[in-house]
C-alpha cells in the first residue's frame, strides 16, 4: 500500500514537472515570437529550393519489388540490349513518302534508338502489297487508312530523357499522328498532374476557409491557420530533396492530406487559447503560453498515433507505400511544430 501511494505521488510530481516545462516552453515561444516568425519565413527559401529540385517519379512500375520477373526483364532490356522504353505512333491519312520523312525526323530525336516502319525493311519503291499479309497487317489498317510506327528509346520508360523525347516527337508530328505506349501515358500523367495539383489544392484551401469561417467566431483566424499549415507543407515538400525523388502520387496527395490531418491541431490551439483567456483575463501572452502547453500535451499523443499509421505504410513491398508514408509522417511532425511555434 505504501509503495502504491509512493508511486502515485511520484507520478503526480512528474506530471507537474512536465507541465511546468511545457508552460516554460510556451512562454519562450511567446517571448520570441517575432524572431521565430522571421526564421520561419527565412526557412521558406531553402524549402522552396528543395521543392523545385526534388525529382518527381511518374513511373508507378518502378515501385514494384525488384525480384519480380517483369522488373528483371526491364533491367535486362536496358543493360544488355540498350532498349528501355518504346512507343507506338499511329498515323492516319498520310502519304508513304511523308511518313518516311517523318520517321527520319523522329529518328534524329535525342535518346531515340530506332524507329521501325515499312521503309526499315524495304525501299518505298517496293509496293506494300507484295508483302505477306501477316507483315502487311502489322503496319497497316486499310479500314481506317492508318499505319503503325514503332519507336524504341535507349532510356527507361519514365526517365526524364524519355519524357523529353516524347514531348519533342509530339512537336514534330501533326494532328494525324497519335502517340501511344507507357512512356506516352507517363508523359500525359506528368502534364495532367502538374496542371491539376495547384487547382485542387486551391479548392481545398477555399473550402477550409469557408467551413472554418462559418464554424468559428472570427473570419481572420482561419487565414492564420492556413498560413501556419501552408508553411509546414512547404517545409515538408522542400525536405523531400533529401530523398532525391518522390512519386507523382505522393506529390499529388501530400499537400491536401497534410492540410486535412494537421488542421485539428490549430483548431485545438485556438480553443485552448480562448479558454485560457477566461482564466487569465487581460494577459494574452500568458493565455497563449498555457494554450501552447495544453496543445503540446494533448496533440503529441494524437500525432504519434498518426505518424505510426503512416510509418506502417513503409513496410509494404510495393514501395509506393514507403514513399507516401515517409513524406506524410514528416508532414505531421512539421504540422505539430508549426502549430505551436508559428
Protein language model annotation of sequence segments:
Residues 84-88, 146-148, 254-256:
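Short, solvent-exposed beta-strand edge segments and adjacent coil->beta transition regions
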Residues 91-92, 118, 152-154, 182-183:
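Active-site-proximal beta-strand/loop segments in catalytic clefts of secreted hydrolases
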Residues 67, 71-72, 97-152, 187-191:
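Extracytoplasmic
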Residues 1-56, 157-342:
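Membrane-embedded transmembrane helical bundles of large multi-pass transporters/channels
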Residues 82-84, 95, 108-111, 171-177:
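Short glycine/proline-enriched coil/turn segments at helix->beta-strand junctions
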Residues 88-90, 148-152, 178, 266-268:
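Soluble periplasmic/extracytoplasmic beta-strand elements of cell-envelope proteins
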Residues 90-96, 284:
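Conserved short loop/turn motifs at secondary-structure junctions
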Residues 51-90, 126-142, 152-153, 157-161:
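Solvent-exposed, non-transmembrane loop/terminal regulatory segments of multi-pass membrane proteins
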